[in-house]
Curated annotation (Swiss-Prot):
GO biological process: negative regulation of TOR signaling; regulation of apoptotic process
Assembly information from the UniProt record: Interacts with FBXW5; TNFAIP8L1 competes with TSC2 to bind FBXW5 increasing TSC2 stability by preventing its ubiquitination.
Protein name: Tumor necrosis factor alpha-induced protein 8-like protein 1
UniProt gene name: TNFAIP8L1
PANTHER family xref list: TUMOR NECROSIS FACTOR ALPHA-INDUCED PROTEIN 8-LIKE PROTEIN 1, TUMOR NECROSIS FACTOR INDUCED PROTEIN
GO cellular component: cytoplasm
Keywords: Cytoplasm
InterPro entries, per database record: TNFAIP8-like, TNFAIP8_sf
Organism name: Bos taurus
Subcellular compartments: Cytoplasm
Family: Belongs to the TNFAIP8 family.
Length: 186
């Protein structure tokens, strides 16, 4: 039986093309201004924490690539009902995560890195389950890289520390998350 499909080939080409274009410079073409500001601030905080411009760029690039590929899958109607339900659970979990992150920033002495790390890893698992067979092993590796960094307790502790420049990065990230929550875009 011949399994060739033009539709499948076109979808693969579209994902490949978009993944090649996904960089910080063109991210604004695929995401709104607020999301772009949050990603820029995440880039700066990561660059400060890792002391590596290359690592910070890789993190944001991987995040954008996965988001773009997921958007392509959604637009092409490639996800089944169960996968869409998992994505809905992921969206709800991401909203709770954003509200928790903002709350930890706004209320002194409430920060608990384990809560954020656990929730981030739950989001990672939901994303793996939802995207499943539609993404390559390399894309799943990108998901692991992004969430592994974000859930790193040392990174979270640095980000929520009262020291500069992390305090400024966190304030701008939380300002963006608050706008995204208000606009219901997360």
């Amino acid at each position: 039986m011949d399994t060739f499909s033009t539709k499948s080939l076109a979808l693969q080409a579209q994902k490949k093309l978009l993944s090649k274009m996904a960089s910080r410079a063109v991210a604004s073409a695929f995401i709104d201004d607020t999301s772009s500001e949050v990603l820029d601030e995440l880039y700066r905080a990561t660059k400060e924490f890792t002391r590596s411009r290359k690592e910070a760029q890789k993190l944001v690039k991987n995040l954008v690539k996965v988001a773009v590929k997921l958007g392509v899958l959604l637009r092409a109607g490639q996800l089944g009902a169960e996968e869409l339900a998992r994505l809905q659970r992921l969206r709800q979990q991401a909203r709770r995560l954003a509200m928790t992150a903002v709350s930890f920033h706004q209320v002194d002495f409430t920060f608990d890195r384990r809560v954020l790390a656990t929730t981030l890893l739950e989001c990672r698992d939901l994303l793996h389950q939802a995207a499943g067979a539609h993404l390559t092993a390399k894309s799943h590796g990108r998901i692991n890289h992004v969430f592994g960094h974000l859930a790193d307790c040392d990174f979270l502790a640095a980000l929520y520390s009262p020291a500069e420049p992390y305090r400024s990065h966190l304030r701008r990230i939380c300002d963006g998350l608050t706008r995204m929550l208000d606009e219901d875009s997360i």
